[in-house]
Amino acid sequence: LRDVRLISGFGVHPEDAPYAKRELMDSFKAQSIFVPNNLRRAMREGVADIIPAFLGEVPFLFRSGQIPVDVAFMQVSTPDEEGYCSFGISADIIFSGAECAKIRIAQMNKYMPHTQGDAKIHISKLDAVCLVDEPLVEVPTPTPSDIDMRIGNFIANEIPDGATLQIGVGGIPNAVINALRNHKH
């Protein structure tokens, strides 16, 4: 293989990405829309790149062909009664990546939850499926610092009861969640 571009989103694996090594640069070029832990070393060494875009812009970049997608690898739930597999906890850029891909390869995992919304794909749209039954990878939860907790309390006081939130990863988001425990809904 030569000149294969591997585009990823939020990598949660703690170890370095095995494809992001200097000796493999002729074969693989790692790119990400975030700076995930598993690519930080490679990015510092110039072996991997960040795609300078907001998360919300990535679907447009896929659909416009600015980031072409030949093959999309994804993890999905088992199909529902209508044959749809949910992207579950990965309902971000993979939906548009899969939509634009020439080939779609799915790891179907019974542990992937079915989630509401349009982030799903019909099993007939998958070119290959690998059945896997393994717990989902979890992001380690960092302990919020005292400053994180003060910021979290300030933010939580501004959030009305019943609000819908998108929460990131890190000490401050965890502090916000902790501070929201007094909210009822």
Placement of each model-derived feature along the sequence:
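Conserved alpha/beta enzyme-core scaffold
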Residues: 1-185
